[in-house]
């Protein structure tokens, strides 16, 4: 039996910006409560970040959970359930469901860097879930740490009292015992009724080669027992529970989980897509009818085409995507073909980091070499006959004459930056058609709120923001609504043929600059052929930019010494005819580098 008195359970998550020491603090808590022995911890950083990419980039992608036992100073034994949540905006939905499973949060802030944009976003989510929040200042042993200033900042920006914030250094373990005591004394226990009908929240799920789908749950009411039959309200599928248990971070099996507890179950579920995150699990024999509040399915925001560089890898790519989908239900894909790139997939992602990580996992775990087309967003179009359509691939755009109005998605962005870079950050937002909403100062840092079109952000906004602010600015966004926009479909023509992989929807005012930059880049990278190749950027039938790749010259008159000029002219005319014919029928080989470079062009 695992069941602990509900008053001695504490469910909490750690909220922090990337790199503020969240996973390191989790390591220390596990070590000090004896979750793993020192030998098992040795040489392992970030125990909860199980993917290589998570460790390398120092970010948490999947939510993880661990149960710790702690004997407090009052002599009682407590059970802590720690949910390690992702810190990045793309994984905000993973954060929201992890927070819904907890009653309190530790807010970790780097004492040398202060509050960042994503700290704000996640704290507001925690406050929305009525969490009790304990501020923790990490890295206080650094020479650059300014704890008093950061405390003031927490109070000014977030509006929670930070006077009794816990001072720690997660790396050395300084102050971590105080965190354990604060969890006991300052965070509330869960509520729940053991005798009520079973009601549990599905927090996360992942695929395990041996066990099938492992489902992470938080029991709200009732008890979840091994061998019982459960039903998911969202998909109305029923399963027999095979295993029940929790992580310490190792898997430990038990007979049942009671109210307020967090653990896992396995039930011969075949696909992660069958387990919707945020779904409600109940008893199949006497089900509850209403779902737990506040969950929505993850909707892809950014789309792009992924094509294998080597056409023979297509089947491998298809299998790899299926495997990734097992673990990441928010990632969607469908097959597409491109005249330039062959067979591939059109994929949907939650945001740019998600796109980058999926791409990196495909190339790293499955050894695939991929080309990604330009990222695009979902546009809404009202046609002249009153029909409304949504498109996420510029190739599918109907004829201009049939379109009455195009609408594009807008976001609200919150940007925090040191004062000295404010000018260049504001200029960047202005260049990207941003509309400033507010500008406030927090100590020596400025906080700007902007409305921006998502179209302008998906491309390379984050990279540009980091470069104009020397890496100091942080950025967070959420979708707001759709607004009408003057967008045009720009195509790149090589030797008069449109290259489908390079067509994109751009704002009319930006089309010329974008088109010119792309054709110049293509000109550098397409090798000369026997005939000259025009590279054009066009909107409809109007060419807005053009470059020409000069032909290779073969000296056909070399074998004529002296003699009549008409002989030379005849040979030159013949060559001219041949080149003309070649230009008509010749095929231009566009190297992969040219695609990749054209897609990475700056405006």
Swiss-Prot record:
Gene Ontology biological process terms in this record: positive regulation of translation
Compartmental location: Cell inner membrane
The protein's Enzyme Commission number: 3.6.5.n1
Gene Ontology MF, one: ribosome binding
Enzyme class, broadest EC rank: hydrolase
Catalysed reactions listed for this entry: GTP + H2O = GDP + phosphate + H(+)
The UniProt record lists the keyword Zinc: no
Domain tr-type G as annotated: residue spans: 7-191
Any one cellular-component term (Gene Ontology): plasma membrane
Coiled-coil ranges (or none): none
Record keywords, A-Z: Cell inner membrane, Cell membrane, GTP-binding, Hydrolase, Membrane, Nucleotide-binding, Protein biosynthesis
Residues that bind GTP: 19-24, 138-141
Protein's membrane topology: Peripheral membrane protein
Annotated function: Required for accurate and efficient protein synthesis under certain stress conditions. May act as a fidelity factor of the translation reaction, by catalyzing a one-codon backward translocation of tRNAs on improperly translocated ribosomes. Back-translocation proceeds from a post-translocation (POST) complex to a pre-translocation (PRE) complex, thus giving elongation factor G a second chance to translocate the tRNAs correctly. Binds to ribosomes in a GTP-dependent manner.
Family statement drawn from the similarity comment of this UniProt entry: Belongs to the TRAFAC class translation factor GTPase superfamily. Classic translation factor GTPase family. LepA subfamily.
Protein's name in the database: Elongation factor 4
Originating gene: lepA
């Amino acid at each position: 039996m695992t069941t602990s008195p509900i008053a001695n359970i504490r469910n909490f998550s750690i909220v922090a910006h990337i790199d503020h020491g969240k996973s390191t603090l989790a390591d220390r808590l596990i070590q000090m409560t004896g979750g793993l022995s020192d030998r098992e911890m040795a040489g392992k950083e970030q125990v909860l970040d199980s993917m290589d990419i998570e460790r390398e980039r120092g970010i948490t992608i999947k939510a993880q959970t661990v149960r710790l036992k702690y004997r407090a100073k009052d002599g009682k034994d407590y059970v802590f359930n720690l949910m390690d949540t992702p810190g990045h905006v793309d994984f905000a939905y993973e954060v929201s469901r992890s927070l819904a499973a907890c009653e309190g949060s530790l807010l970790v802030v780097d004492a040398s860097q202060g509050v960042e944009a994503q700290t704000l976003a996640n704290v507001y989510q925690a406050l929305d879930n009525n969490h009790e929040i304990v501020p923790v200042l990490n890295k206080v042993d650094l020479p650059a740490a300014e704890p008093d200033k950061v405390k003031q900042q927490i109070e000014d920006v977030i509006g929670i009292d930070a006077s009794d914030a816990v001072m720690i250094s997660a790396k050395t373990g300084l102050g971590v015992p105080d965190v354990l005591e604060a969890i006991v004394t300052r965070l509330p226990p869960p509520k729940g009724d053991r005798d009520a009908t079973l009601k549990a929240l599905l927090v996360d799920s992942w695929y395990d080669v041996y066990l099938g789908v492992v489902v992470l749950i938080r029991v709200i009411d009732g008890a979840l027992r091994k061998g019982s039959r459960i039903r998911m309200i969202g998909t109305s599928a029923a399963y027999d529970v095979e295993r029940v248990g929790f992580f310490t971070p190792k898997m430990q099996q038990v007979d049942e989980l009671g109210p307020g507890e967090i653990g896992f179950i396995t039930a011969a579920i075949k696909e992660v897509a069958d387990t919707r995150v945020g779904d409600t699990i109940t008893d199949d024999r006497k089900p509850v009818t209403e779902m737990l509040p506040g969950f929505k399915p993850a909707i892809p925001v950014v789309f792009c085409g992924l094509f294998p560089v080597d056409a023979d890898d297509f089947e491998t790519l298809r299998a790899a995507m299926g495997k990734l989908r097992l673990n990441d239900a928010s990632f969607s894909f469908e097959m597409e073909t491109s005249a330039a790139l062959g067979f591939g997939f059109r994929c949907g992602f939650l945001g740019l980091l998600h796109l980058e990580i999926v791409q990196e996992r495909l190339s790293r775990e499955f050894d695939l070499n991929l080309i990604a087309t330009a990222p695009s967003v979902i546009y809404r179009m009202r046609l002249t006959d009153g029909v409304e359509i949504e498109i996420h691939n510029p190739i599918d755009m109907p004829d201009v004459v049939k379109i009455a109005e195009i609408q594009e998605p807008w976001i609200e962005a919150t940007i925090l930056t040191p004062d000295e870079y404010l000018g260049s950050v504001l200029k960047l937002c202005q260049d990207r058609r941003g509309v400033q909403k507010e500008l406030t100062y927090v100590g020596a840092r400025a906080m700007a709120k902007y409305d921006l079109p998502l179209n302008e952000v998906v491309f390379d906004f984050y990279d540009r923001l980091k470069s104009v602010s020397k890496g100091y600015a942080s950025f967070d966004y959420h979708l707001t609504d759709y607004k009408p926009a003057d967008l045009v479909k720009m195509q790149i023509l090589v030797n008069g043929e449109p290259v489908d992989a390079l067509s994109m929807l751009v704002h009319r005012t930006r089309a010329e600059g974008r088109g010119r930059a792309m054709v110049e880049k293509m000109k550098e990278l397409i090798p000369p052929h026997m005939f000259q190749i025009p590279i054009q950027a066009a909107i409809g039938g109007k060419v807005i930019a053009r470059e020409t790749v000069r032909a290779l010259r073969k000296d056909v008159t070399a074998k004529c010494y002296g003699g009549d000029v008409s002989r030379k002219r005849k040979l030159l005319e013949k060559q001219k005819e041949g080149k003309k014919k070649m230009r008509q029928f010749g095929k231009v080989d566009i190297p992969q580098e040219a695609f990749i470079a054209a897609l990475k062009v700056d405006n």
